[in-house]
């Protein structure tokens, strides 16, 4: 019987959860779910100078917001240092690794010699077969792996295929430093083995690491997990995605106003596809996702595509769910605090009532919040430039006879208001737009908004008439 699939996401808490890391986590999560397995979380916090608790919290928060739940407790790599030392010493005891007492001066001499001879700098193995009794007094050694010197190390990769590394290019690298701390290369192997990880899905910038890690697995006689090294995300210009392209942390995408489901949908299509399907539910992603279908070529991040997908998700969202998502993000967006303060019982009811019209025009929650500001604006309304031009003398003259029509309304519904204004326009020999444009400007202070009859209903009779009255004098 085959082992259950166990994947892992292993971020370093030296900053936010960046978008590439989020995609890696998503691929690990989807593959584990697809196979009925587990995704574990390990925080690679061995770099004590750069690792912070705030970054760890931001990573956990980002994963939770994206809906990527992990199995069990998050594991700290730093706390496992005694186990890393134990395995390093075991490798020495078994003749698979050795103590190296080379001084910094000797190592620099090796590098200089290699440079002079046009070779890449490599440790020359001078302590590989020497007796530790020859060790200089008072020098704390490092532990180096005894890497094979002939042949090649092959990484069997589900995405890249078999990748071969000549062993002459892989020197006896350090697995334990002289202060007893493990190197990243060593700690990762020990942790993945002890956690029972069967499948490693990570960026292809780790491919060279995979060769060295395979040497450690083989030295310990452990099974090597199935590797899948996925292409990095590039910007629209084809260069590796960076801050220059607007590469942000997941927390920033949240504050910009993207929905987690939309971001998941966009990220899964960066380097993986299922036919021509663009929009897919989480259940479909889980059913269809397989590492063998990941592309070898780098995917390009397209903000406009993400925005379009987010808009689709917003339009198809339940009004209450979208309302809740907007309220949750208000503290993080510009002007959101003022909007949140306006959401008393009446304000909440108005915003929910406006949601069908607002979500048709917005691609992000920030745009949704901006579109909703007219509901809570103080009188007299500040007019934007286009609204002011619509409320010139001609616009006000068109609007003046509309006021008594609205004032006389018995039923204040979108349908009855639509019928009354259309009848008035016909009687005046005007097109509906000739009335609707200055009316919208008077009600919202803007030239664009949800449907003008929906706006009248959301604002209510009293507020609508008061705003129109402010403009016609």
Curated annotation (Swiss-Prot):
Its EC number is 6.1.1.17. Residues 113-133 have a biased composition (Basic and acidic residues). InterPro entries: aa-tRNA-synth_I_cd-bd (IPR045462), aa-tRNA-synth_I_codon-bd_sub2 (IPR020751), aa-tRNA-synth_I_CS (IPR001412), aa_tRNA-synth_I_cd-bd_sf (IPR008925), Glu-tRNA-ligase_bac/mito (IPR004527), Glu/Gln-tRNA-synth (IPR000924), Glu/Gln-tRNA-synth_Ib_cat-dom (IPR020058), GluQ/Sye (IPR049940). Residues 113-136 are annotated as: Disordered. ATP binds at residue 243. The keyword Protein biosynthesis applies. Gene3D superfamilies: 1.10.10.350, HUPs. It is found in: Cytoplasm. It is an enzyme of class 6 (ligase). Keywords: Aminoacyl-tRNA synthetase, ATP-binding, Cytoplasm, Ligase, Nucleotide-binding, Protein biosynthesis. It holds the Pfam family Anticodon_2. Its main location: cytoplasm. GO terms for molecular function: ATP binding; glutamate-tRNA ligase activity; tRNA binding; zinc ion binding. The keyword Protease does not apply. A motif ('HIGH' region) lies at residues 11-21. Catalyzes the attachment of glutamate to tRNA(Glu) in a two-step reaction: glutamate is first activated by ATP to form Glu-AMP and then transferred to the acceptor end of tRNA(Glu). Belongs to the class-I aminoacyl-tRNA synthetase family. Glutamate--tRNA ligase type 1 subfamily. Monomer. This is Glutamate--tRNA ligase 1. It comes from Brucella melitensis biotype 1 (strain ATCC 23456 / CCUG 17765 / NCTC 10094 / 16M).
């Amino acid at each position: 019987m085959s082992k259950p699939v166990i994947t892992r996401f292993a971020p370093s808490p030296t900053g936010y959860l960046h978008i590439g890391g989020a995609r890696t986590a998503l691929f690990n999560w989807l593959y584990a779910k697809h196979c009925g397995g587990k995704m574990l979380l390990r925080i690679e916090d061995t770099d004590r100078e750069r690792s912070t608790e705030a970054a760890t919290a931001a990573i956990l928060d980002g994963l939770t917001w994206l809906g990527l739940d992990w199995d069990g407790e998050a594991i700290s790599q730093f706390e496992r240092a005694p186990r890393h030392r134990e395995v390093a010493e075991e490798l020495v005891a078994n003749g698979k690794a050795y103590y190296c007492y080379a001084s910094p001066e000797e190592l620099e001499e090796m590098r200089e010699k290699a440079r002079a001879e046009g070779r890449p700098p490599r440790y020359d193995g001078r302590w590989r077969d020497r007796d530790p009794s020859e060790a200089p007094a008072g020098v704390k050694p490092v532990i180096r792996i005894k890497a094979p010197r002939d042949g090649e190390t092959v990484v069997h990769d589900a995405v890249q295929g078999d990748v071969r590394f000549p062993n002459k290019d892989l020197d006896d690298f350090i697995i334990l430093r002289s202060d007893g701390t493990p190197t990243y290369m060593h700690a990762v192997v020990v942790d993945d083995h002890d956690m029972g990880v069967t499948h490693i899905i990570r960026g292809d910038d780790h491919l060279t690491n995979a060769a060295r890690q395979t040497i450690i697995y083989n030295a310990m006689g452990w099974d090597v997990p199935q590797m899948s090294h996925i292409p990095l995300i590039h910007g629209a210009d084809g260069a590796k995605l960076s801050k220059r392209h607007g590469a942000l942390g997941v927390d920033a995408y949240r504050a910009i106003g993207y929905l987690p489901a939309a971001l998941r949908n966009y990220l899964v299509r960066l380097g993986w596809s299922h036919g021509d399907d663009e929009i897919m539910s989480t259940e479909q992603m889980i059913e269809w996702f397989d590492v063998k279908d990941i592309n070898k070529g780098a995917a390009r991040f397209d903000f406009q595509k993400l925005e379009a997908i987010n808009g689709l998700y917003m339009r198809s969202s339940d009004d209450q769910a979208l309302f809740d998502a907007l309220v949750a993000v208000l503290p993080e967006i510009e002007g959101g605090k003022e909007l949140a303060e306006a959401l008393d019982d009446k304000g909440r009811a108005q915003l929910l009532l406006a949601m069908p019209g607002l979500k048709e025009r917005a691609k992000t929650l920030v745009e949704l919040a901006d579109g909703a500001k007219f509901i809570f604006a103080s009188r007299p309304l500040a007019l934007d430039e286009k609204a002011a031009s619509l409320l010139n003398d001609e616009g006000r003259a068109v609007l003046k006879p509309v006021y008594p029509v609205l004032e006389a309304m018995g039923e204040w519904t979108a349908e009855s208001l639509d019928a009354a204004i259309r009848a008035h326009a016909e009687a005046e020999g005007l097109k509906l737009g000739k009335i609707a444009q200055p009316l919208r400007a008077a009600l919202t202070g803007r030239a664009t908004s949800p449907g003008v009859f929906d706006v009248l209903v959301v604002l209510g009779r009293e507020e609508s008439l008061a705003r129109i009255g402010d403009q016609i004098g």
